[in-house]
Curated annotation (Swiss-Prot):
Entry binding sites for GTP: 11-14, 40-41, 45, 112, 206-213
BP GO annotations: F420-0 metabolic process
Assembly with partners or alone: Homodimer.
Protein name per its UniProtKB record: Coenzyme F420:L-glutamate ligase
Catalytic activity from the UniProt record: oxidized coenzyme F420-0 + GTP + L-glutamate = oxidized coenzyme F420-1 + GDP + phosphate + H(+); oxidized coenzyme F420-1 + GTP + L-glutamate = oxidized coenzyme F420-2 + GDP + phosphate + H(+)
Keyword Magnesium among record annotations: yes
Pathway it works in: Cofactor biosynthesis; coenzyme F420 biosynthesis
HAMAP family, A to Z: F420_ligase_CofE
One MF term in the entry's GO annotations: GTP binding
InterPro entries cross-referenced by the UniProt entry: F420-0_g-glutamyl_ligase (IPR008225), F420-0_gamma-glut_ligase-dom (IPR002847), F420_ligase_CofE_arc (IPR023659)
Annotated family: Belongs to the CofE family.
Binding site for a divalent metal cation 2: T151, E208
Family annotation (NCBIfam families): F420_cofE, PRK13293.1
Length: 254
């Protein structure tokens, strides 16, 4: 068994209004059940999620956090505008975004963007993946899966890895519960983070900085799944998320 990870090279700089599916199809031929891994940065650029700090007016909460942390209140306001809950204020802001993804600084990106500008993540990554996927399928005539990715740090390790923040035609988690292991024991809790693993694999080719590749095809693995899918299926239910519960306890003690 094997699979390929194929970098889609020579993707041009993306601007607001660009047709990503058309651009991708011009650069590479697609096959049935290809899994398209697309960096959130180019999706956000095409959707016009670019802003400047000088256009941000901080509110009362942003000013209060700035007074406590010494951060730029305009940047804090930008983070708050995309967040439903703040867990940590410094040395970085750890938040859950409006889309439900928990990450640093609401996923706002200061890299791979023109000087003086910053980039919000896609407002609804699942909806973005669906739109891109349907158009790619229409243009190519192939059945495709889409994963929109971002890079995240890990709580207990150094370094970032690719993670899925939006999906189309793929389940984010494979549940092995009820299957048997090598010794015939029934698995009770094993759940494999398929979408995140694929995002991490693609990130080896995507890289970071000036040499980044924003689109990678995973070919040879069949995780195609028609019907409604959402990255939210991979988020822990609130009553099971002990890390968030612990962060809330620490926050409320201050």
């Amino acid at each position: 068994m094997k699979f390929e990870a194929i970098a889609v090279e020579k993707i041009p700089l993306i601007h607001e209004g660009d047709n990503l599916p058309s651009i991708i199809c011009e650069k590479i031929g697609l096959q049935d059940r290809d899994i398209m891994i697309i960096a959130s940065t180019i999706v956000a650029k095409a959707e016009g999620e670019i802003f400047r700090l000088e256009d941000i007016t901080p509110g009362e909460e942003a000013l209060e956090i700035a007074a406590r942390t010494g951060k730029d209140p305009r940047f804090i306001q930008a983070v708050l505008s995309k967040s439903r809950e703040v867990f940590v204020e410094t040395p970085f802001m750890l938040v859950t975004t409006l889309a439900g993804h928990t990450c640093v600084n609401a996923g706002i990106d200061e890299s791979n963007i023109e000087n003086g500008f910053l980039l919000y993540p896609p407002e609804n990554p699942d909806a973005s993946a669906l739109k891109i996927g349907k158009e790619l399928e229409k243009l190519s005539g192939k059945k495709l899966s889409i994963i929109i990715t971002d890079t995240n740090g890990r709580a207990f390790k150094i370094g970032q890895t690719g993670v899925a923040i939006g999906i189309y035609n793929i389940k984010p988690v494979k549940r092995w519960i009820g299957e048997k292991d090598l010794f015939g024991k029934v698995l009770e809790i094993t759940e494999q983070a398929i979408a995140d693993e694929l995002a991490g694999a693609a990130n080896l080719l995507m890289g970071e900085g000036a040499g980044g590749i924003p689109v990678v095809i995973i070919r040879g693995l069949d995780y195609y799944c028609e019907g409604d899918t959402s990255i939210k299926e991979s988020y822990r239910p609130e009553n099971m998320d002990v890390i968030k519960q612990g962060l809330r306890c620490l926050r409320n003690k201050k």
